[in-house]
Amino acid sequence: MTTNKSSLSYFTDALWINNQPLVAILGICSALAVTTTVTTALTMGLAVSFVTGFASFVVSLLRKITPESVRMIAQLIIISLFVILIDQFLKAFFFNISKTLSVFVGLIITNCIVMGRAESMARHISPIPAFLDGLGSGLGYGWVLVCISIIRELFGFGTILGFHIIPKIFYASAAHPDGYENLGLMVLAPSAFFLLGIMVWLVNIVRASKTKR
């Protein structure tokens, strides 16, 4: 793959222009499970960024000596290595978050974004651009999850990062039965897909308006 793109443009393109969840509609399955709170969404976003960035770097580094016949197996092994590293790191230093995320950290290996960047980009370009492309793809995935989680946590629990944003005096009580109640729909998994769908729709509107210009 020959290109005149600067190294930084790989990062910015992956972060915004070719955002994987919003443009390619990849990596959306975890939006169901890890976006109920900002903490879990942020952690998953950073974990995927770490794995995608460094896995892409290593895949690119070994691209000229990796036989085509075992290419995808080699990529899976490399991705698995970094998934295990981040999983053990979370268990050692952020045990409560790791416990909340449960198996979903380990399932990063099945995330379409990670393998997709390794297969479509990292094995065709040099290590530094590959790392920046992977990092941008991971962070692009992460900010989408965080946006969804902010809405879900705020309206589902009345908090952001565990801090109460909606004052408790606004909530319904025996004295004020008509007060505010948390929106239970936001705690349920389908709300993540609805919110993601709205984000994809808005992105398509913006892209279409720019094309018309």
From Swiss-Prot:
It comes from the Bacteria. Its EC number is 7.2.1.1. One of its GO terms (biological process) is sodium ion transport. GO terms for molecular function: oxidoreductase activity, acting on NAD(P)H, quinone or similar compound as acceptor. The chain crosses the membrane at residues 14-34, 42-62, 77-97, 101-121, 131-151, 154-174, 183-203. It catalyses: a ubiquinone + n Na(+)(in) + NADH + H(+) = a ubiquinol + n Na(+)(out) + NAD(+). One of its GO terms (cellular component) is plasma membrane. The keyword Nucleotide-binding does not apply. It is a multi-pass membrane protein. The keyword Ion transport applies. Disulfide bonds: none annotated. It is found in: Cell inner membrane. Keywords: Cell inner membrane, Cell membrane, Ion transport, Membrane, NAD, Sodium, Sodium transport, Translocase, Transmembrane, Transmembrane helix, Transport, Ubiquinone. Composed of six subunits; NqrA, NqrB, NqrC, NqrD, NqrE and NqrF. NQR complex catalyzes the reduction of ubiquinone-1 to ubiquinol by two successive reactions, coupled with the transport of Na(+) ions from the cytoplasm to the periplasm. NqrA to NqrE are probably involved in the second step, the conversion of ubisemiquinone to ubiquinol. Belongs to the NqrDE/RnfAE family. PANTHER family: ELECTRON TRANSPORT COMPLEX PROTEIN RNFE, NA(+)-TRANSLOCATING NADH-QUINONE REDUCTASE SUBUNIT D. This is Na(+)-translocating NADH-quinone reductase subunit D.
